[in-house]
Amino acid sequence: IFDEKSADGIVGAVDLEQYDYRKGSGSAVRATEATVAERIPPRLKVRRGAPLELPHIMILIDDPQKTVIEKVSAKKASLKKLYDFTLMKNGGSIKGYLMDGETVAETDSALAALGNSEEFEKKYGKGTPVLLYAMGDGNHSLATAKEYYEELKRENPDKDFSNHPARYALA
């Protein structure tokens, strides 16, 4: 939902195991434009020493039936409000709500349906890999997060990274 006065969305974690920014990628999470590899090393240098990372990543979904974001937005009144404040410099205001277990399950189910390969192929052609999450903004930030995560795995081959915080990026 977007107009001049409001924009609804979902803040969540992206599994970097599902992301590939390289040209020709068929991963479920991928870039919509070329990633300039030369931009990654300077960002990676900053990321290595950062006590906190606050990325600006916007991911888009193709959801013409409005089964994901709009369904969550319709439930706002029943969700716990986490924050509600005015932004500086006439930036408007922002509110955030905590999705309850039922809403998370419904959202996961709706996203899984969007990732159905048969439905995706009907729309985009046979053999087209499902693009569930398209990078809208912050592609280089996400690519840097991916490189940092891959670097950690290379440096610690015996470590279990299945639940490591570096495996996920805020988007």
Per-range role (PLM):
Residues 159-171:
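Class I SAM-dependent methyltransferase SAM-binding "motif I" and its flanking Rossmann-like core
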Residues 51, 99, 103, 133-140:
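Short, contiguous, pocket-lining structural segments
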Residues 1-91, 119-123:
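N-terminal extension/subdomain marker
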Residues 88-109:
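Glycine-rich phosphate-binding "P-loop"
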Residues 58-60, 134-136, 170:
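A structural signal for short, well-ordered beta-strand segments and their strand-loop junctions
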Residues 113-155:
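Active-site beta-strand/loop microenvironment that shapes enzyme catalytic pockets
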Residues 52-55, 127-131, 164-167:
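Short, well-ordered loop/turn elements at secondary-structure boundaries
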Residues 77, 153-161:
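A short alpha->loop->secondary-structure connector
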